[in-house]
């Protein structure tokens, strides 16, 4: 029997068993002292026991704490579907996606990148179009590109403009404003021969100096203008109303006035000068010449119906032939129906073409005479206030419009023998609140002047109207109504910059006396919002335009008061820097704000008519809201009469 263990040979079998102990995850751990707790854990000492627990937003046993990624754990965060969860150390945040901004009231609200400069990356010439969470850029007509980069293409620009390179981009420009200068004495046709070659020219140029300011229009002898084959304009120069025209420049050599030619463009500019889009000549030595008889023009800037002409070396603006008329019926009339004035203008050039060297013009009241205006053209104008009476103006009115009529008398001498020319003209205005007050004899109205620093003085008016059309104000200093009637109150703003300011009714209330500070007040509008408890109150317009409107059913104060006075505190709201349109919740609480009596309009008295039903609340008029000061009818007629 063999021995299992031998001193010479021995097998050893060893069995090793490994144990891995994984501690169970717990929220707390016992510790000897608080110093053993993790920096993101909380230490609790209860008698002899000390425990460590991870703070909210962390996970672990208190001795070791790691950040909990709430965004990765379902239900660990409360971000809505429209927001993105972003994990932070010990917490998380809900952020809006790109193109949205977090609002405490509306959640993720779209950012209008087009509203403010710098928010979009659109090209300066492009139009920015806002979308939900994004925006797009569109190049203007005639331009190519993705909107972030826009370039014109040859022939794509409007009349009188050309596509030229400025820096790294192609843009549409007026060559009268953007060009280079050529001031070289040797370009004169009177200068002798030379070896200049305009091979480097290209683009828009203007000739200046004593050598002449424009290309000659006739063939130039060879060996002039400091070159061998002088170049001249084969054609005539355009007038300023033709814009950019195509022409050919010819080079004279070997007995041929147009042996070589080059395409060019020409434009006549206001002020009596020309600009040329020159191209390099096809050969050398060729150079562009100038006409020395065309000295530098000294016209003041001519109008669109004038050309700068030289007469015996003197430059002045002359009427263009294109604007001449031969018949009085073709005389152009410009009628402007303004807010406060009516102006009729006649073209001075056309009057001159009809033989009016001197113009005498006046209205029904001859004290209202004509005067000269220099704008885009020279005009002879007369002005009358848009009121009944001044300058002989007559006002007529129907249910929808107020019309102001007058007659212009025209003569070319102080005395009239042969012909008396009359031009009848009229402006019609839709009846809105302002026009209605202006055309009423004694409207029930209150007025207040408000001065805004740097922007002028404004006048605010408040009036009482008979219907929801707000076109028939009550007449006189008082009115009597039953409690079944409705009060239609309109406020309106005049003067100053109406494009910037709107009228805001902050507090409107009634009192039984004319005292606006009477402690007995019934608020119709308070803190910009209508009284919610009174269902008869309707605010049609407030903080949206230069006018405000509201209505309320007539009432009387308890205590046998028969008089009602209306008071409105108004505020001029700057739409550039303020939010003007009120936002009114369904439930409102009285704020007790102090009323500024310097901004209060007062109206009344309105007397209660006992027992008798006055007008009930009318249905909305078919007129709707008429836009302020929009002239719907502009008319002018021409009548020739013998004396």
Swiss-Prot record:
The lineage of its organism: Eukaryota, Metazoa, Chordata, Craniata, Vertebrata. The gene is UMOD. Residues 336-431 are annotated as: ZP-N. Residues 152-173 are annotated as: Beta hairpin. PROSITE patterns: ASX_HYDROXYL, EGF_2, EGF_3, EGF_CA, ZP_1, ZP_2. It comes from Bos taurus (Bovine). Residues 600-608 are annotated as: External hydrophobic patch (EHP). The record marks 589-590 as: Cleavage. Residues 174-293 are annotated as: D10C. One of its GO terms (cellular component) is cell surface. Residues 336-587 form the ZP domain. Residues 1-26 form the signal peptide. Residues 456-466 are annotated as: Internal hydrophobic patch (IHP). This is Uromodulin.
